[in-house]
Design a protein with these regions (language model features):
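Switch I (effector-binding) loop of TRAFAC-class P-loop GTPase G-domains
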Residues: 24-48
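Switch II (G3) loop of P-loop NTPases
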Residues: 53-65
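Walker A/P-loop
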Residues: 16
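Conserved C-terminal guanine-recognition region of P-loop GTPase G domains, centered on the G4
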Residues: 77-140
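Canonical P-loop GTPase G-domain recognition
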Residues: 122-171
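ATP-binding Walker
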Residues: 13
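Single conserved hydrophobic/aromatic residue that forms the stacking wall/gate
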Residues: 178-187
């Protein structure tokens, strides 16, 4: 089992903000406008003595004719194929969208370790509302409400991640190759 974690979801759910928090660097650009992240970004993180690679992806949009959204979708699919654990991120403020349903079907078909990350749970009401995401039908998938902006819930998220990756904190050479190859890559 590899120690590769992919952060995926629809546009503007906070994937890049969480990525920056996990790698403890501002490597991914964060913006309110969708489509800013177009390729995969790689970084290293560690928690409880376990080191793992984190992949940030652009926002997944199904059946788009936009050339950029098609390329983003390709990058997301590649990240999903590389990952041993998927962080499927949704937005508590917006609630469930049709894109969340579309993407949850893909996640179910992959049959990989997944954690449903209900982001933007910035207060108790939003945290309670995060329970609606169980409607996505991801059975046996833990769901955790977080706020990637202020960091609440990220410790618990990292506990879940570290329980799903192997105990050997050595990364495969492939992980380091990806880090070097994609750190500045874009199209």
């Amino acid at each position: 089992m590899s120690n590769i974690i992919a952060i995926v979801g629809r546009p503007n759910v906070g994937k890049s903000t969480l990525f920056n928090r996990l790698v403890e660097k501002r490597k991914a650009i964060i913006h309110d406008e969708s489509g800013v992240t177009r390729d995969r970004h790689y970084g290293l993180s560690d928690w409880n003595g376990k080191t793992f690679t984190v992949i940030d992806t652009g926002g997944y949009v199904e059946n788009s004719n936009n050339i950029f959204e098609k390329k983003i979708k390709e990058q997301v699919i590649l990240a999903l194929s590389e990952a041993s654990v998927i962080l499927f991120m949704v937005d508590c403020k917006d609630g469930i969208t049709s894109l969340d349903y579309d993407f949850s079907k893909i996640i179910r078909e992959l049959n990989k370790d997944t954690i449903l990350v209900a982001n933007k749970a910035d207060n108790n009401k939003l945290e309670i509302n995060s329970n609606e995401f169980y409607e996505l039908g991801l059975k046996n998938t833990p769901m955790i409400p977080i706020s990637s902006i202020n960091g609440s819930g990220t410790g618990e998220l990292l506990d879940l991640v570290s329980n799903k990756i192997n105990n050997d904190d050595k990364l495969s050479p492939v992980s380091y190759t990806h880090l070097r190859a994609h750190e500045t890559w874009s199209y």
